[in-house]
């Protein structure tokens, strides 16, 4: 099966598989990027949101995506479901297979509810977590965050052993920083036969699984 993944900044991915378009974590960093054209998310069938932090959900971006969608359902945590209801956006807490992926501790205290998603048996997105024990063949993996590290991310990927790792959560890095960090990640993952697939912002890659 072919899977096309478009990176729309930071943790936001547009995944196209099985004739469906799934938007994951449409956050503020994406919405504020002047390169984002709303038509990029035309016709999405599902919107999956791992948790409530602004870098993973922008109400403005979400509302725009829904207006341009094929009647897309929004799937998220109970906590964010309640928040979105205050903005007159309906969300559900089931549908797409989920997996346990607790939010890592952040400098200001515990993180919010966080859920991982398995998309159509091909790709897993853990949100803000390195504490999960399962994945599909493609893993969207955070490597740069206030709550984690490149070492933790690489160790977790080597534990769960996907076929491909797509780095996410990297708005915090400069261009040179990404090059350096992902070179190290590739060296670590190559030892276990895991291919690191770096996708630049607003570019797409098609993988076969």
Q: What residue ranges belong to the model's regions?
A:
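Active-site neighborhood of phospho(di)ester-bond hydrolases with catalytic His/Asp-centered motifs
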Residues: 23-27, 44-55, 75-78, 124-128, ...
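Binuclear metal-ion centers of metallo-dependent hydrolases, dominated by the metallo-beta-lactamase
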Residues: 85-96, 103, 154, 164-209
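A short helix->loop->beta-strand "cap" motif at the edges of active sites that frequently abuts
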Residues: 20, 68-73, 160-164, 191-194
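Pre-active-site segment of Zn-dependent metallo-hydrolases
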Residues: 12-49, 59-64, 105-108, 129-132, ...
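Active-site HxH/HxHxD metal-binding segment of metal-dependent hydrolases
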Residues: 35-95
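Short, polar loop motifs at secondary-structure junctions
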Residues: 9-11, 76-83, 126-131
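Active-site environment of divalent metal-dependent phosphoester hydrolases
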Residues: 29-32, 53-57, 81-84, 131-134, ...
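Catalytic core of the metallo-beta-lactamase
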Residues: 12-16, 23, 95-156
């Amino acid at each position: 099966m072919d899977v096309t993944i478009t990176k729309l900044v930071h943790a936001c991915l547009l995944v196209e598989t099985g004739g469906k378009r799934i938007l994951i974590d449409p956050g503020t960093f994406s919405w504020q990027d002047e390169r984002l054209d709303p038509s990029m998310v035309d016709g999405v069938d599902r919107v999956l949101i791992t948790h409530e932090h602004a870098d993973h959900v922008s109400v403005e971006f979400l509302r725009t995506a829904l207006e341009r969608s094929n009647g897309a359902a929004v799937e998220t945590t109970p906590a964010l479901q309640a928040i979105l209801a205050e903005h007159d956006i309906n969300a559900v807490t089931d549908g797409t297979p989920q997996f346990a992926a607790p939010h890592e501790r952040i400098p200001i205290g515990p993180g919010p509810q966080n859920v991982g998603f398995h998309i159509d048996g091909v790709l897993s997105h853990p949100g803000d977590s390195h504490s999960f024990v399962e994945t599909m063949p493609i893993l969207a993996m955070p490597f740069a965050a206030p709550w984690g590290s490149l070492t933790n991310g690489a160790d977790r990927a080597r534990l769960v052993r996907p076929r491909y790792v797509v780095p996410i959560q990297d708005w915090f890095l400069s261009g040179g920083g990404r090059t350096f960090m992902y070179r190290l990640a590739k060296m670590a993952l190559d030892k276990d036969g895991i291919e690191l697939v770096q996708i630049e912002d607003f570019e797409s890659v098609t993988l076969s699984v």
